[in-house]
């Protein structure tokens, strides 16, 4: 494909996806020419152009720009900034997107989100080709089938771009990755371009919020709902009310919040936000293990969930009852200490107890899962007692956030090559301690070798299964009450004093 064919194909793509109207074809060509810094064009339909997918079309244009020195470097960071600028030139204006979403929402919230999710892929804001590279599988555990993924969709930064980014002046704009200032932002070497990014307003519990999708799509229709105001994460009564109001308006979605303390919280604590989507996690499928009840709330069904972490599930017809009871449990947990169970509410004035809440609809009912969290550290566990312990850092050492709490492991990209190397050495019997790719996995791999009859046909399946089992053990470590008779007794001690 030459440049003219690629521009023609991109305009046809924008027409097909309804990003532009038929009458805007000439305008669209000129927008693309401006980005390409090219001043000649003739409309060229070609078989190649008609067959090409969006990634191939954009790659052709980026290569052309690099060959003509319009693009300074040919690395992923520069290419991403450039192709986002190209797509941004064809993305409808923010108000057009908002109006379309609101118009569809009047028909049904699901029609609105269906359209908006597809739109976010059509503009290449969600890079489907990259998301497809993520490695995913399911592992059967005593808690049901959990999801494992090795993230490949976040591109690795190249050394040249990292070096160039160091020389850029510091900037506090946009204030963070979530703020509405990202809409249409051109990006820079150390900040992603967002010209093709559009958000839609939603009112939750009488406050102004926005809805968008995650560009990394860890699960189906992975959305982010964020406060219009850049304000810190806070788990409180208003948070429960917002979560339940969200699932009232979008009953086909679940929504949850990361905890509001370091170690047990998410990566963005400075901007209040939730994550949701159209997906059934293993935790949602997990049954109630022990029924419980709270005085004065006998109409609320409550129970301890059969899950590696410590989860109280509440279910009621009226969201108000859940909000009141959840607030009561939160208030009690914030101030709760049980030294015998290694739970301290605070040390030196620093609070440790919080909750990761998740809301959903169960038929017509409203349901709230409250996951008890504690971020206490000790000299033996400087990253947190209720955090992946060092023995499992070869697989997972990052924080256990909302998505993982629910049973979806987001494992680091390095594991793709490392686990492939482990598989090769399990088959060949080579020493793992001498290869930097397998060194950290050597002890774990030796246990695998001792427990299985390994063949070329089953090695991948076995390594994936054992990786999933490690993740379930990591979740057990993140649970404040262990799944032992003593742990159960301590959990009930807390519940009984609420």
Positions of predicted regions on the chain:
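Active-site microenvironments that recognize anionic phosphate/pyrophosphate groups
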Residues: 1-225, 229-232, 306-308, 322-326, ...
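Catalytic or ion-translocation cores adjacent to nucleophile or general acid/base/metal-coordination motifs
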Residues: 238, 247-270, 276-330, 334-337
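Helical scaffold of the NTase/Pol beta-like nucleotidyltransferase catalytic core
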Residues: 196-198, 230-255
